[in-house]
Amino acid sequence: MTGPDARPPPLAEQVLERGHEMRTTLARAAAMLPLRPDEQAAETFMELPPARILRYPAANAGSAMAPVLIIYSMINRPYLLDLQPRRSVIRQLMQAGADVYVLDWGEPAALDRDLDMEECIGEFVRTAVSAIRAAHDGSRLNVAGICQGGTMAVCHAALHPESVQSLANFAGPVDFHTPDNTLWRL
């Protein structure tokens, strides 16, 4: 049978229908794949082995906005702040005119097991803050800490308030005197 009203033979119909089902299934499977970060390009501002400080320059050079230091948790990856162009804390801060710095602890290794909070705050965070302030004519920083980094940020701000313009703590524990000392045992 030929012409515009002609139907394909039954086997061809089955193949076409099966192909449509496969395309639909593949599209659903692709939507469930893990999200890969589309990270904004960063420069390494400073190496502090095992950590490093990443710098994301402000979108408009010469902005009067104070720099932002994000102190991330040692066990999480900071790219979570920069997953996609429209879902990026880092890009939003850059667009607002901030130079953004991220303290990236790198992948945990056996050598890091002896790092304690005193060393992390007293050496790594303090050194990062000092270097960033020096690069910005001594400006005080907007400091944001996430999870364990929030605890470090709060401790640094308490020890060195002269270096901090503002402080944001996202999910960082600060009360270690709960009735059962729950956080202390973690």
Predicted regions and their residues:
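N-terminal cap/leader regions of alpha/beta-hydrolase-fold enzymes
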Residues: 1-186
